Amino acid sequence: MSNIKRYNIFILLSTLARNIVEVFSSVLLYKMGYSLKEILLFYSLVYLTGAITSTIVIYLTKILKPKYILIVSSIIFSGSFYYMSIMDKTFTNLIIFSIIYGLGAYTYHTIRHYYAIKSINNHERKEIGSILIYTNIAIVLSSVIGTYVETKLSKLILAIIVIIISVLAVIPIFKYEDRTNNNKIKIDKIEKNKLLFFICEQAKVINLSLQPL
């Protein structure tokens, strides 16, 4: 099996698991009794944790292969959702969940793009667009599965499903032929217009997440 096929399977399954969490977190927190202000604080802490994590993770690739970072990320992320499924409604638990969630989410989002671009053979790069197809399929499936399980079953069952899918997602990565050069890492300054676009885009994501409330 080629790298791109392994990576697409990883993207399909990992996006399916993660999107269940990303789509339903605000709804589940609201159902637990958290206010809109507390949910906005949750997102603020997630992005703050993400900003720090994204920078550190790139330098971690000098020490660890990206696939191992992705595997650890999957463990942290699925663990964060399990924690939310069993936690009591307290301010401290919300802070802890926000930090764990941010660590797992931004370790994943940072490395998966870096990993695809740096690791895939030149002759396979023309197929990278297929990643978007698998991502969109997973987004649709996650909405359907998440809605059904959350309404018919429980948060704990939903968390267990996320953990199982996350474990299955990392299996193809074990056999991924890693061609990254860990000694060459370049951090470029983000242009102001791109930074503004990113901020507006994330504000849109938060707004969409809060719409069901």
PLM region spans:
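Structural signature of the two symmetry-related core transmembrane helices
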Residues: 68-83, 163
